[in-house]
């Protein structure tokens, strides 16, 4: 495919973003109609409007503070034109989702720790972004340093969950099956936080990609929580919808061509929020399935490195499984336009969510 052909992908970034928002809102309204109240649509709309407004006010401020993204030289050369686009947009959107989500069921004790761990990962990502900006190079915290801080925040959340009996000891699977894991939930929970937050971080490489995929998965988790027996779990479902709304409001500023990037500030917080909601609601299986695209992005990096090292010769050169990792760059270098990659990945995530809803535990 030539560059000219790649640009023929129909529609604009705004049109596709509005279409995704309309589709997600319709799904929430259908769920609300079945449950008898605006348990998903209201927090989705409130957080979305608040996030859009805060970003509309805050993005020019980020630009004035010269908080422009430093683009790594190893990435696609077409991305060099994005250099200088304001980053750390997570500072604007994440608090919007947390605040609105906390108002869904103020008396539910689970919402505060979810909000705190989400904000903690936002701060970790913010430190990473800030160090990258001050050094004027796309490297912030050391990988070990970042992982240690993430593990500390996740560990404190898991400790709270364990002390309050809020952490499952058996994983709910489709068709009523349960997988007893006992104390293994502790290392598994830690792994979920680290893997999910870094998966969302890797996915945040194209305009609107992570924001759209993250919102889709968050709403998917919320919908399956409402479909469960005994009235579902409206508190966590509404919280997830609020967070999804915050990322959708941000998406209107982050869609191609992006006015702002969420940075690690937003992507790490997204992974933490997904992990916390999934763990407290025993939705690890739905998260694995619905977030399959996030998993694919992570695996693409792992496999790329493994193949290169396994085939590396004396000259230091090895073979590559993909043109470039993560996976979205592989399609970019294959001639796909950025918008085509993003919309296609959104579509895959929507299909995975639909499959996950069929297989609700």
Swiss-Prot record:
It comes from the Bacteria. It is a multi-pass membrane protein. It comes from Synechococcus sp. (strain RCC307). GO terms for cellular component: plasma membrane. Belongs to the glycosyltransferase 4 family. MraY subfamily. This is Phospho-N-acetylmuramoyl-pentapeptide-transferase. InterPro entries: Glycosyl_transferase_4, PNAcMuramoyl-5peptid_Trfase, PNAcMuramoyl-5peptid_Trfase_CS. One of its GO terms (biological process) is cell wall organization. It catalyses: UDP-N-acetyl-alpha-D-muramoyl-L-alanyl-gamma-D-glutamyl-meso-2,6-diaminopimeloyl-D-alanyl-D-alanine + di-trans,octa-cis-undecaprenyl phosphate = di-trans,octa-cis-undecaprenyl diphospho-N-acetyl-alpha-D-muramoyl-L-alanyl-D-glutamyl-meso-2,6-diaminopimeloyl-D-alanyl-D-alanine + UMP. It is found in: Cell inner membrane. It holds the Pfam family MraY_sig1. Keywords: Cell cycle, Cell division, Cell inner membrane, Cell membrane, Cell shape, Cell wall biogenesis/degradation, Magnesium, Membrane, Metal-binding, Peptidoglycan synthesis, Transferase, Transmembrane, Transmembrane helix. NCBIfam families: mraY.
């Amino acid at each position: 495919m030539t560059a000219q052909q790649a640009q023929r992908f129909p529609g604009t970034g705004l049109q596709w973003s509005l279409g995704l928002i309309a589709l997600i809102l319709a799904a929430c309204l259908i769920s609300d109609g079945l449950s008898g109240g605006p348990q998903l649509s209201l927090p989705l709309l409130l957080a979305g409007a608040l996030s859009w407004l805060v970003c509309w006010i805050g993005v020019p401020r980020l630009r004035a503070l010269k908080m422009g993204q430093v683009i790594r030289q190893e990435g696609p050369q077409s991305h060099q034109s994005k250099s200088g686009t304001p980053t750390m947009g997570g500072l604007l959107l994440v608090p919007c989702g947390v605040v609105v989500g906390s108002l869904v069921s103020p008396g539910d004790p689970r919402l505060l720790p979810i909000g705190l761990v989400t904000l903690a990962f936002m701060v970790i990502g913010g430190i990473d972004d800030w160090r990258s900006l001050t050094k004027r190079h796309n490297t912030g915290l050391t990988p070990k340093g970042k992982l240690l801080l993430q593990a500390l925040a996740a560990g404190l959340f898991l400790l709270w969950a364990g002390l309050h009996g809020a952490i499952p000891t058996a994983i709910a699977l489709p068709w009523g099956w349960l997988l007893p894991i006992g104390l293994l939930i502790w290392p598994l929970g830690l792994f979920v936080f680290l893997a999910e937050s870094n998966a969302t971080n890797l996915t945040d490489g194209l305009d609107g990609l992570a924001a759209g995929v993250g919102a889709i998965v968050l709403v998917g988790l919320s919908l399956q929580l409402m479909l469960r027996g005994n009235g579902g779990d409206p508190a966590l479902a509404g919280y997830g919808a609020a967070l999804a709304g915050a990322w959708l409001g941000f998406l209107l500023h982050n869609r191609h061509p992006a006015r702002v990037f969420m940075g690690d500030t937003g992507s790490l917080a997204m992974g933490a929020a997904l992990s916390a909601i999934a763990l407290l609601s025993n939705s690890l299986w739905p998260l694995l399935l619905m977030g399959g695209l996030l998993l694919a992005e992570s695996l693409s990096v792992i496999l790329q490195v493994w193949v290169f090292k396994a085939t590396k010769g004396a000259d230091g050169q090895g073979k590559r499984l993909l043109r470039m990792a993560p996976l979205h760059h592989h399609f970019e270098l294959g001639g796909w336009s950025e918008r085509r990659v993003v919309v296609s990945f959104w579509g895959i995530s929507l299909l995975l969510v639909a499959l996950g809803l069929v297989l609700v535990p």
